[in-house]
Amino acid sequence: MKVFFKEIFEYHNHINQSLMESMKDNNDMLKHIIPLLSHSIIAHQNWNATILNTATSWANDLISLEECIACDNQNFQNTLRILNENELEETVEYVNAKQVVYKSTVLDVLFHVSNHFSHHRGQIVAEIRKGGIDPIITDFIYYKRWIMGYLERFKVKIQTS
């Protein structure tokens, strides 16, 4: 299951970085997508911090594109650290926005983060289309076909541990 989560978060990082790269010179579109993008990335950062029991860097939900790029890459590295150092069945305790204390497994938190990305990425893609732009393809299966084609073409071995 850890290999699966590593692959899923590699996909999210790749797609997030590709989306940001494709929009970096479109200031009009960035005004529409930065709130959703930064919210998703900060939420990921906060969940990582909850699991790792560390402090977060940003208190607000609106960060620049450059900060989104850096934070997304750091989030990916921290998620890999979580997967390497924690058991998926471990329980983490956290307080929600209404100050209610909950406990969830690392597995459930990571699955939630993944779904959260997918939800807001759909909104981001809809905004891009609404602006008359064809967005990059963000489907997981498309990514898998692309990465597998790349690996086959360049004879790259997949490391699964």
Please tell me what each predicted stretch does.
Residues 6-59, 100-161:
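Short, contiguous alpha-helical
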